[in-house]
């Protein structure tokens, strides 16, 4: 139950929940032909200052950039490499 969680556990849970929204945003963007790039590993303290985030009540868990790729992007037409699903998925 959430009310019995420590603040650290709640923060961890909240961060994980942000990925549900992230996935939905990526899919919705793709439907509109908008490119996305999800990112972790950013300097959250600097980004929170730039965005004027209230650090007492809010935290940036993940960043998603949105936009349109350059028409002269040499990589956009490369064939995507995908492993067969049976090489990394095991159904139980």
What are these regions (language model features)?
Residues 1-92:
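Acidic, surface-exposed loops and disordered segments
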């Amino acid at each position: 139950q959430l009310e019995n969680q420590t603040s650290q556990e709640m923060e961890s849970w909240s961060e994980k929940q942000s990925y549900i929204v992230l996935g939905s945003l990526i899919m919705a963007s793709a439907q509109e032909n908008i490119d996305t790039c999800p990112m972790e590993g950013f300097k959250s303290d600097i980004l929170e200052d730039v965005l004027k985030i209230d650090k007492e009540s809010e935290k940036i868990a993940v960043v998603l950039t949105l936009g349109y790729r350059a028409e002269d992007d040499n990589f956009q037409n490369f064939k995507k490499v995908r492993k067969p699903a049976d090489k990394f998925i095991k159904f139980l």
